[in-house]
A protein has these predicted regions:
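A short acidic, Gly/Pro-enriched loop at the edge of an enzyme's catalytic core
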Residues: 127-138
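A short SAM/SAH-binding and catalytic strip from SAM-dependent methyltransferases
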Residues: 137-150
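N-terminal auxiliary segments of SAM/dcSAM-dependent transferases
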Residues: 1-29
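Conserved alpha-helix/loop element of class I SAM-dependent methyltransferases that forms part
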Residues: 32-33, 49-69
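Short, glycine-/aromatic-enriched active-site segment of Class I SAM-dependent methyltransferases
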Residues: 173-193
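A short glycine-rich, Lys/Arg-flanked "PGG" loop and its adjoining helix->strand segment in the class I
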Residues: 152-167
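Substrate-binding/catalytic lobe of Class I Rossmann-like enzymes that use SAM or dcSAM, i.e.
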Residues: 191-231
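Class I SAM-dependent methyltransferase SAM/SAH-binding core
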Residues: 70-128
């Protein structure tokens, strides 16, 4: 599949109808006060990466971002981890995602929480970020590589917008040559939009893109426990 067709395919997969309305309807059914919605009220739907807000908080501690920083969230979805990152560190945060439906929902949820002064979102491809070189103090990306076929271009583009000496935090799913992948999975209905690398190849791609790896934590066991507990 060509890059443009692949992007269109992924965009369609992540563009559900009236997502914001469905979230509001769900909150109402749970008896939430829609005039006083909190980050934790939204957590079940807006932090749907593996281990949810528990993982987000671990990554926030690892990142050590500070209030004077401007952080880019690449593949932000509807912005849950972007908002939590900003709320808990005080940093400015900008999220980008390919899905304009996700971005519209992210902006509306951010306004609902009155966080729009510190958090903003833009629809774009991670392969062509609309920012100047050395623009962000830090980069944050949670489980988006699985849909990216050209990982080197994505990582190079992410590195390009990061200031020299800036820190990037990636929380990603990698493949295992000895374990076949059975579809559907959370990020793909079939193999046409799933592109997993082994941990070894992912590290090679990161280094080739210009990153220096300081910390590498394998959370496979915790992820497996999270899936087992969800059954």
């Amino acid at each position: 599949m060509s890059t443009s067709r692949n992007i269109q395919h992924i965009h369609g997969y992540y563009s559900p109808d009236d997502l914001f309305g469905k979230i509001i309807e769900g909150l109402d059914k749970l008896g939430k006060d829609l005039a006083n919605v909190t980050l934790d009220d939204l957590q079940p739907v807006d932090e749907f990466h593996i281990r949810g807000d528990t993982a987000t908080r671990e990554l926030i501690r690892l990142a050590e971002f500070t209030p004077d920083m401007h952080i880019l969230d690449v593949g932000c979805g509807i912005g849950g981890s972007t908002r939590r990152l900003s709320r808990e560190t005080g940093c400015r945060a900008t999220g980008v995602d390919l899905s304009d439906v996700y971005i519209d929902t992210a902006n509306r949820l951010t306004q609902l929480l009155d966080m729009q002064e510190r958090v903003a979102f833009h629809a774009c491809s991670a392969l062509e970020l609309p920012f100047e070189d050395n623009f962000f103090d830090g980069v944050w990306s949670l489980q988006m590589n699985m849909n990216v076929e050209d990982k080197l271009s994505w990582l190079r583009e992410t590195c390009r917008v990061l200031k020299p000496g800036g820190r990037a935090v990636f929380y990603e799913v990698c493949g295992n040559r000895n374990s076949p992948l059975y579809f559907p999975v959370p990020w793909a209905q079939d193999g046409s939009m799933s592109y997993l690398l082994s941990p070894e190849l992912f590290r090679e791609a990161m280094r080739a893109a210009g990153f220096v790896i300081e910390v590498w934590n394998d959370k496979t066991d915790l992820a497996q426990k999270a899936f087992a507990n969800a059954k």
